Design a protein with these regions (language model features):
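Mature extracytoplasmic enzyme cores
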Residues: 1-173
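Aromatic-lined carbohydrate-recognition surfaces of secreted/lumenal glycan-active proteins
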Residues: 1-2, 119-127, 175-203
Length: 203
């Protein structure tokens, strides 16, 4: 992994981190400095109902400008950033997995080519890492999610970390279905094809 990570920071795994703040309105709120460490992505506010759940019809993107007029009621601000995991590769990104297979695995594959599939019947790969918490992320996830499900994930990010009525289960299932599909396509499909071309079993 270190060989690939040294090539480009694009290969670093990414996670979605958040900071949460509560406010009681009416009050004018400054939004500056409320993002967690990482690359700022979006700020969403939502009103809390009497049970402490989010009211989905109150969701509002307040990323710009840097202040917000909080209405009456108890409101929650979700600030999401994308944070790189410097010692892990992005297993949701096909280009990264391809680079991983080209080096160092291709080096050993070429060196012992005559033994592959016979004296060397199979290959073992160290466990890939896809975070569950913080939430997994990759640069193309937002566009892929929109293509898969027809709505913008960013507008619904609070539902991944807090309940908001009947929409909660759908958004979470949609999110992990897309993450799972991207993981399968980037990692499992490419590694399986790499092994098959060399007559190897994936152990």
């Amino acid at each position: 992994n270190s060989t690939v990570l040294l090539r480009s920071t694009d290969h670093q795994a990414k996670t979605l981190v958040r900071a949460i703040h509560d406010f009681t309105g009416p009050v004018q709120i400054s939004l500056e400095g409320r993002f967690p460490l990482g690359t700022p992505l979006v700020q969403i506010v939502a009103r809390l109902d009497k049970n402490g759940d989010l009211e989905t019809d109150s969701f509002k993107n307040v990323t710009r400008p840097n202040s917000w007029s909080c209405p009456d009621g108890v409101w929650r601000l979700f600030s999401f950033s994308v944070k790189a995991v410097e010692d892990q590769v992005d297993y949701l990104r096909p280009q990264t997995v391809k680079a991983l297979l080209e080096s160092p695995y291709a080096v050993y594959g070429n060196r012992y080519r005559s033994f592959l599939g016979t004296d060397i019947p199979g290959v073992f790969f160290g466990k890939p890492h896809v975070a569950a918490e913080p939430l997994p992320w990759t640069d193309s996830l937002r566009a892929r999610f929109l293509k898969d499900h027809g709505y913008d994930l960013v507008d619904s990010l609070p539902l991944l970390v807090q309940r908001a009525g009947s929409s909660t289960a759908k958004v979470r299932c949609d999110f992990y279905n897309t993450v799972g599909d991207m993981y399968e396509e980037a990692w499992f499909v490419q590694v399986s094809a790499w092994c098959e071309r060399r007559g190897l079993k994936w152990i």
